[in-house]
Amino acid sequence: MGGTSAAVPSHGLACAPPAAVTLNPRARRRRASSGSGGHRSSPQQPLRSDLLPPATVACRARSQSASSSNVNFGRGDDADKLLEDLLKQHGEVVYSSGGPPDPTVEADDDAECLSFAVSLAKAASEIKATDIRVLCVRRLVYWTRFFIILTAFSNAQIDAISSKMRDIGEKQFSKVASGDTKPNSWTLLDFGDVVVHIFLPQQRAFYNLEEFYGNATPIELPFDTQRQ
């Protein structure tokens, strides 16, 4: 990740998907495509950091070729028929065994995660990080709710920011980060519902995550983010 010729690594981020998932029936024997969260359609208005409405997350049913399951559905027609039967029986929204999620519980979860994300962003600002962005990405990816993207200017600064964020996560929110333990040109801290991306300037410009996740909702932060 240190240079422009390096491939973007897979960090293996994972957390449980939201309890309510909208399932879109696919065309017969159509191959599943990758997620479309990375393309900008229209600019998003900043979202206040003290308010975040709950939302469902849409996903597409995967064809057998795109699935990692060991279940053998036989021919594609059989898989399509199975999907159609399930949709007729259960409808287009599949819930966990506990039933539909409580909107109040989802809102409380989002509020806690947002408070955590803003606390981490503020800590980065106090250690002189610049161009700090907090993005709500829960509609775009299944494995997290918020991204924090920021720029640092040395490995020592990255290390200080990472250490401060880990302390806040563990002591104030009982969250332990996985990911990079040493500073890199792109350092990642995965707290589950909040994922932090710390870049050196050249890598920040090259990977341009804000553009890739252009449909994410920006969070308005209650402090100066020193945007470039």
Swiss-Prot record:
One Pfam family here: RsfS
A Gene Ontology term for the protein's cellular component: chloroplast
Region named Disordered: 1-54
Highest taxon in the source lineage: Eukaryota
Keywords, in A-Z order: Chloroplast, Plastid, Transit peptide
A single GO molecular function term of this UniProt record: ribosomal large subunit binding
Assembly information from the UniProt record: Interacts with chloroplast ribosomal protein uL14c (rpl14).
UniProt-recorded name of the protein: Protein Iojap, chloroplastic
Organism name: Zea mays
